[in-house]
């Protein structure tokens, strides 16, 4: 989540949803009575002598006083429903009900009814710390492109051209391409571009895949190699068109969630009394202030009956700087969590 602005006096926060997990934090931020501003579509009403007619749907920027928050799993969007408090006059929307949908890549402004309190700041800090960066290197026959893959797209930083060494059938692919590619890749890492990234992904065409793998091994670079039909700058955009960017980004986070679930389950099975399972048990230890790590299924967070209970637990764990993981129910981590009531907590000390 990227926070674009924070106005303490007005209780305003403006942000961009960067990853799917940010929707969980946004869900925690917005309460009934808060006003959410965002882009949506609204049908025009046209007054004629014969009466009122419905016109086309147009994009408009609206403010909605939230009465209900829901999550649409199919579209992976949060839905904020309530009365419109601010809208362009031409759409005649003020006072009527409307739903603003927010998904990955969307920009939204929230005006908190109760102001920017410590709980809100804590959520924003933790959400901002979840940003993951992927360094993307795309190797083509005549150029190497370098960029950063983010949840809302790709930022190409440089495109470096090169010429293969030697010519003719007597020269192997390795002899012609290994040295120039190795030189460029080495410069990328020496320049510091790989610092503060969570993963390095190298895109390369089928023809040069073996050469590039050998280069990475010789340079000691740990990277995931993804095959594309064409490398270079075109290869980067091929990744985006093919929908692989989402997989690359989610893979940075999901193994961590799975590892945490397995680790806390192991602690639970050890019988040492330093872990509990099930929402009811988690509520108790959260109230006592002894939760070190909390893992909750998104099914509990978005559930009508369990939402308020989960929000209370999250608030208690947030306030004591505990680690929190919210996992999708359909993920491998979520499936392992389900038999234990969708909630696990690792404790600072044993209950035995």
Swiss-Prot record:
<comment type="subunit">
    <text>Monomer.</text>
</comment>
<dbReference type="GO" id="GO:0046872">
    <property type="term" value="F:metal ion binding"/>
</dbReference>
<dbReference type="GO" id="GO:0070651">
    <property type="term" value="P:nonfunctional rRNA decay"/>
</dbReference>
<dbReference type="GO" id="GO:0032790">
    <property type="term" value="P:ribosome disassembly"/>
</dbReference>
<dbReference type="InterPro" id="IPR038069">
    <property type="entry name" value="Pelota/DOM34_N"/>
</dbReference>
<dbReference type="InterPro" id="IPR005140">
    <property type="entry name" value="eRF1_1_Pelota"/>
</dbReference>
<comment type="function">
    <text>May function in recognizing stalled ribosomes, interact with stem-loop structures in stalled mRNA molecules, and effect endonucleolytic cleavage of the mRNA. May play a role in the release non-functional ribosomes and degradation of damaged mRNAs. Has endoribonuclease activity.</text>
</comment>
<keyword id="KW-0378">Hydrolase</keyword>
<keyword id="KW-0540">Nuclease</keyword>
<dbReference type="InterPro" id="IPR023521">
    <property type="entry name" value="Pelota_arc"/>
</dbReference>
<dbReference type="GO" id="GO:0005737">
    <property type="term" value="C:cytoplasm"/>
</dbReference>
<dbReference type="InterPro" id="IPR004405">
    <property type="entry name" value="Transl-rel_pelota"/>
</dbReference>
<keyword id="KW-0479">Metal-binding</keyword>
<dbReference type="GO" id="GO:0004519">
    <property type="term" value="F:endonuclease activity"/>
</dbReference>
<dbReference type="InterPro" id="IPR042226">
    <property type="entry name" value="eFR1_2_sf"/>
</dbReference>
<dbReference type="InterPro" id="IPR029064">
    <property type="entry name" value="Ribosomal_eL30-like_sf"/>
</dbReference>
<keyword id="KW-0963">Cytoplasm</keyword>
<protein>
    <recommendedName>
        <fullName>Protein pelota homolog</fullName>
        <ecNumber>3.1.-.-</ecNumber>
    </recommendedName>
</protein>
<keyword id="KW-0255">Endonuclease</keyword>
<dbReference type="InterPro" id="IPR005142">
    <property type="entry name" value="eRF1_3"/>
</dbReference>
<dbReference type="GO" id="GO:0071025">
    <property type="term" value="P:RNA surveillance"/>
</dbReference>
<dbReference type="Pfam" id="PF03463">
    <property type="entry name" value="eRF1_1"/>
</dbReference>
<dbReference type="GO" id="GO:0070481">
    <property type="term" value="P:nuclear-transcribed mRNA catabolic process, non-stop decay"/>
</dbReference>
<comment type="similarity">
    <text>Belongs to the eukaryotic release factor 1 family. Pelota subfamily.</text>
</comment>
<dbReference type="GO" id="GO:0070966">
    <property type="term" value="P:nuclear-transcribed mRNA catabolic process, no-go decay"/>
</dbReference>
<dbReference type="Pfam" id="PF03465">
    <property type="entry name" value="eRF1_3"/>
</dbReference>
């Amino acid at each position: 989540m990227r926070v674009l602005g924070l106005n303490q006096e007005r209780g305003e926060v403006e942000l961009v949803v960067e990853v799917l997990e940010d929707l969980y934090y946004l869900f925690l931020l917005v309460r009934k009575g808060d006003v959410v501003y965002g882009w949506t579509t609204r049908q025009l009403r046209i007054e004629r002598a014969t009466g009122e007619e419905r016109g086309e749907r147009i994009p408009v920027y609206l403010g909605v006083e939230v009465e209900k928050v829901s999550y649409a799993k199919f579209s992976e969007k949060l839905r904020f429903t309530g009365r419109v408090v601010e809208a362009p006059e031409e759409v005649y929307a003020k006072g009527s009900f409307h739903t603003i949908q927010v998904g990955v890549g969307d920009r939204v402004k929230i005006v908190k009814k109760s102001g920017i309190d410590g709980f809100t700041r804590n959520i924003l800090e933790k959400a901002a710390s979840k940003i993951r960066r992927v360094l993307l290197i795309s190797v083509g026959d005549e150029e190497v492109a370098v960029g950063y893959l983010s949840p809302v797209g790709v930022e190409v930083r440089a495109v470096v051209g090169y010429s293969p060494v030697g010519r003719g059938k007597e020269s192997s692919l390795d002899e012609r391409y290994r040295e120039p590619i190795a030189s460029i890749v080495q410069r990328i890492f020496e320049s510091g571009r790989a610092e503060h990234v969570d993963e390095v992904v190298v895109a390369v065409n089928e023809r040069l895949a073996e050469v590039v793998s050998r280069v990475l091994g010789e340079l000691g670079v740990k990277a995931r190699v993804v095959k594309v039909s064409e490398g270079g700058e075109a290869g980067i955009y091929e990744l985006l068109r093919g929908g692989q960017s989402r997989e690359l980004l989610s893979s940075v986070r999901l193994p961590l969630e799975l590892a945490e679930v397995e680790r806390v389950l192991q602690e639970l099975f050890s019988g040492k009394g330093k872990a509990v399972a099930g929402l009811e048990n988690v509520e108790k230890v959260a109230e006592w202030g002894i939760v070190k790590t909390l893992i909750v299924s998104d099914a509990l967070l978005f559930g009508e009956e369990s939402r308020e209970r989960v929000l209370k637990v999250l608030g208690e764990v947030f306030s004591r700087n505990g680690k929190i993981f919210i996992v999708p129910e359909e993920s491998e981590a979520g499936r392992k969590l389900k038999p234990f009531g969708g909630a696990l907590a690792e404790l600072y000390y044993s209950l035995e």
